[in-house]
């Protein structure tokens, strides 16, 4: 393992399925941070259907990839439906929210 792991909380040098790294719990959003520094943040989220993250913005761009299911993303008042295997980039400083559908 690296002396300073830039990517943490996940096995290094091991083939894995990203969907197996975080599991949804009923009535809550579960997160697992994989990388966090001044330049990048990588976090896995798992949502049960009906759960959401309320409107907020961030200082950097945010990229989401839906691993399973479907999500409704509102970015600057525009709605996007993102399905399994699809991704969406949400620009920095634009308000956005996430809803598991």
Predicted regions and their residues:
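Short, surface-exposed secondary-structure edge patches
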Residues: 44, 63, 78-81
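Asparagine-centered strand-capping/turn motif at beta-strand->loop junctions
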Residues: 100-101
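Glycine- and acidic-residue-biased ligand/ion/polar-headgroup-sensing regions
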Residues: 59-72, 76
């Amino acid at each position: 393992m690296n002396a300073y792991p830039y990517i943490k909380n996940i096995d290094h040098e091991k083939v894995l399925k990203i969907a197996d790294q975080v599991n949804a719990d009923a009535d809550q959003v579960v997160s697992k941070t994989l990388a966090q520094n001044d330049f990048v943040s990588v976090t896995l989220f798992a949502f049960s259907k009906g759960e959401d993250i309320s409107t907020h913005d961030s200082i950097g761009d945010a990229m989401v990839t839906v691993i399973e299911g479907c999500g409704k993303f509102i970015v600057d008042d525009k709605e996007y439906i993102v399905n399994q295997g699809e991704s969406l980039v949400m620009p920095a400083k634009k308000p956005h929210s996430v809803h598991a559908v």
